[in-house]
Structures are given as C-alpha cells and as structure tokens.
C-alpha cells in the first residue's frame, strides 16, 4: 500500500508541476501566531493585538468568527470585524499577518441559535445543522450546505486576496464528531468529497493566499489521504486543531507517512495549540513535537488565560516561551512552488 501511494503521489506531483510551472506565488509568513477565542469580542481582540504589536517572535494572529456573524442573510456579508483587525495589524510596529478561521459549529451548544445563518435552518437545507456528540455542527456532507459555505469563503477570499497582511483562511476541524447511527446520507467519502469541493473553490477565489484545511479526522485513512492529494493539487495547507506530543491525529498520521507517502516536504502544514494539550505538556514540549515530528510551518497558540498553571498560560508561560524564538519550519513547501515572503 505504501509503495502504491508513494507512486501515485509522485505521478500527481509530476503532473501538477508540469501544469502549473508558472503558477503565481503564495503569501508565506510561517511562524508562531496567537489564536483568539470565538467568544472574544472585537474590541478585546483589538486590545490584545496592540499588546503583541512589538513582539518580533509573533508573526500574526488567528481570529475565529462564527458563520452566523459573517453572513447576516443569504448572500449578505458583514466583514467589518475583519476590516478592523487588518487595520489594527497594519498599525503595529512589527509586521503581523491575519488568518481568519470560519466556525461552522458549536461544541457545547444546547440550541441551534447563533451558529449558522438563520436561513440555513430551513427545510431547504435539511435544517442546516445536525446534533454532534456535544453540540451542533453544519451538515457539511450535503452539497446544498457546502455550496453556502463555499460562497462565504469565496466572498472573503475575493475581498482580501490583494491585501498583503491577509495570510489566508482556515476551517474548523474536518471531523464532525457525530454519534452513531450516522444521519441519512452521511459517510466519510461524502464528507471528503465536499471538502475537496471547498478546497478547489477557495483556491480559485484567492490564488495567492493560504487555505488551512484542519485535517484532524475524517473516519477513513484513505479519505484523509485523498484530502492531502487535493491539497497538493490546489496548493492548499493541511492543518489541525491540536498538537499533542506522541499522539497524532489521523491527518498528522497521514502527512507524516504512517499510512503511505510522507508529505512533510511537499505540503504547507499548520496546527493549533489548545488548552487540552497545555494541561499535560509545556509549551516547549509541544513545540519540540511540532518542529521535530510534525514539521509544521504555522503554529496558532491559544491565548490561554484560564486553564492550567502559570507555565501554561499566555502571559506567564506561552508568551515568555515564544520570546525565546523557538524553532519552526520556514522552508517553502514543494507544492507551493513560489512563496511570497
């Protein structure tokens, strides 16, 4: 199986580079980023951006914004918060980049309100949401719902593609965390096919910006490998929502070669650091795993002010560690061809 996947990957790369030798470059500002909470207000995030404005070891920020807050009615968008973040980042004394992560679920919700635009809750979209193990998540395996998520990504991509401080877009994690029995029509293959549609559409909308698909789990290693192939073909970035030393997600297993070809020199790679791993590991242990094993280029560190002891919190643990300039991979990934620094 490994030999077959490696051969298939080699052929894919050959075809890809033959077809896209003159492809335009992609913005490339790898490094350590601070990641804000979905529940942080715009004003709070703007204050926090000022606090890290002079920190040379921090390359930028990731903001997490709910789909509901970005699309106020079908096809009507409110990007005022994104505009404000970019303006604040440009005003800082050191260069800072922006990654926007679109949130299409709520892990702890008891109500469907405020997650996706209200029109999606109609029968046209089968209610738009489905119950997950702990909350609600958009029905992303269904083409009608994915069509609307693609429309949102496309609108953001087209608006900010030309902004040099806009590093790109990120998704929520690929797993939907559904309980069994699965909803009618759901399968790993169906979900993977819709993610591939998203990857292709976003690259068309923003050819020089990054698109971070949070490939943590999708239920099938072969489907996950197919997603890596689609990211290769479109010059997208694989990612994930956690960095847990010695405990890889399915996506991390695939890109490090546990099931076949090793993608670490070929794909742009990223992952977030959440409070779960900070309870068990120090920032240095997490970074060592990310650098030596996962070989990621972008790390999004949660601005943790509530979990763990002082060594795991932002002001007293994470930020002091980042000031030591811990190593991170910066090489332009093979699939990108040209990186714009």
What are these regions (language model features)?
Residues 17-23:
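Sec/Tat signal peptide C-region and signal peptidase I cleavage site
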Residues 6-17:
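Bacterial N-terminal signal peptides
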């Amino acid at each position: 199986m490994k030999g077959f996947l490696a051969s298939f990957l080699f052929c894919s790369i050959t075809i890809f580079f033959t077809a896209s030798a003159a492809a335009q470059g992609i913005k490339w500002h790898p490094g350590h980023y601070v990641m804000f909470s979905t529940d942080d207000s715009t004003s709070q995030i703007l204050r926090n951006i000022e606090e890290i404005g002079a920190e040379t070891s921090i390359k930028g920020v990731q903001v997490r914004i709910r789909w509901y807050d970005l699309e106020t009615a079908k096809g009507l968008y409110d990007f005022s918060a994104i505009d404000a973040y970019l303006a604040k980042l440009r005003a800082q004394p050191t260069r800072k980049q922006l990654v926007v992560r679109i949130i299409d679920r709520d892990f702890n919700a008891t109500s469907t309100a405020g997650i996706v635009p209200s029109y999606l809750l109609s029968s046209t979209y089968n209610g738009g949401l489905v119950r997950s193990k702990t909350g609600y998540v958009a029905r992303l395996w269904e083409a009608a719902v994915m069509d609307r998520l693609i429309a949102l990504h496309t609108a953001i991509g087209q608006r900010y593609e030309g902004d040099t401080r806009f590093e790109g877009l990120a998704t929520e994690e690929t797993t939907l965390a559904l309980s069994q029995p699965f909803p009618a029509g759901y399968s790993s293959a169906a979900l993977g096919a819709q993610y591939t549609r998203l990857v292709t559409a976003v690259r068309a909308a923003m050819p020089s910006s990054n698109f971070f698909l949070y490939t943590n789990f999708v239920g099938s290693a072969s489907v996950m490998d197919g997603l890596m192939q689609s990211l290769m073909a479109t010059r997208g970035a694989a990612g994930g929502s956690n960095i847990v030393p010695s405990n890889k997600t399915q996506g991390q297993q695939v890109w490090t070669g546990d099931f076949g070809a090793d993608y670490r020199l070929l794909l742009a790679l990223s992952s977030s650091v959440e409070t779960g791993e900070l309870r068990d590991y120090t920032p240095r242990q997490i970074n060592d795993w990310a650098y030596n094993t996962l070989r990621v280029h972008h790390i999004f560190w949660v601005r943790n002010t509530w979990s763990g002891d002082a060594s795991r919190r932002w002001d007293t643990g994470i930020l002091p560690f980042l000031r030591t300039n811990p190593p991170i991979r910066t090489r332009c990934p093979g699939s990108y061809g040209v990186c714009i620094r």
